[in-house]
Amino acid sequence: MCRTVVVMNRTLLAATAVLAVASMGLSACSGEASSNSELVKSETSSADITWNDADVKFVQEMIPHHEQAVEMSDMLSGRDVSEETAALAQRIGATQSDEVRMMQGYLAEWGVELDPHAGHSGDHAMGEGMMTAEQLAELGAATGGAFERMWLTMMLEHHKGAIAMANAVVASGVEPRVRAFAESIVRAQGAEITQIEGLLATLGG
């Protein structure tokens, strides 16, 4: 009778030990699963973020920057300028009009409105290289060769400003399409700067 009790006690102890180990294993697995779940959640949240404040600022400010370039290009209509300058203005106007629509699409996709103050003369949000209302009025009043030289000089500064803005978002932005667009601005407007400098040299400006 005593031997039977001893055997039963040993059996109970063994069973209790097995249950304890199993419980610890389940707890560890649960903790690991919870940890993995949090990691996946964190990674998913990061993956969902495709743009940042630098991307938004760039697009909000580049839209009016481009719109001013289009406005300046339209000012050549009916003016007596060289064929090269006229062709350059036409290309700038067409290209940047398309790019404005593209950038407006980005803001709509992100659910972000265009900054109503961006690009306004005298405002802190005015894009780099943009002309003031007074400068545009002076350009409009110019005639002949003086107008062409002034237009090229202003567009040169305008392009340099756009490149500075583009380089900034390449360094700080995260949205792949915005970064690729900014890099294309650096290339295209860099080439146009070279062309403008050549035209100014020809005109003696």
Named regions from a protein language model:
Residues A20-A22:
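Core hydrophobic alpha-helical membrane-spanning segments
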Residues M24-A28:
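C-terminal motif of bacterial Sec signal peptides marking the signal peptidase cleavage site
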Residues T4-A17:
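Bacterial N-terminal signal peptides that target proteins for export
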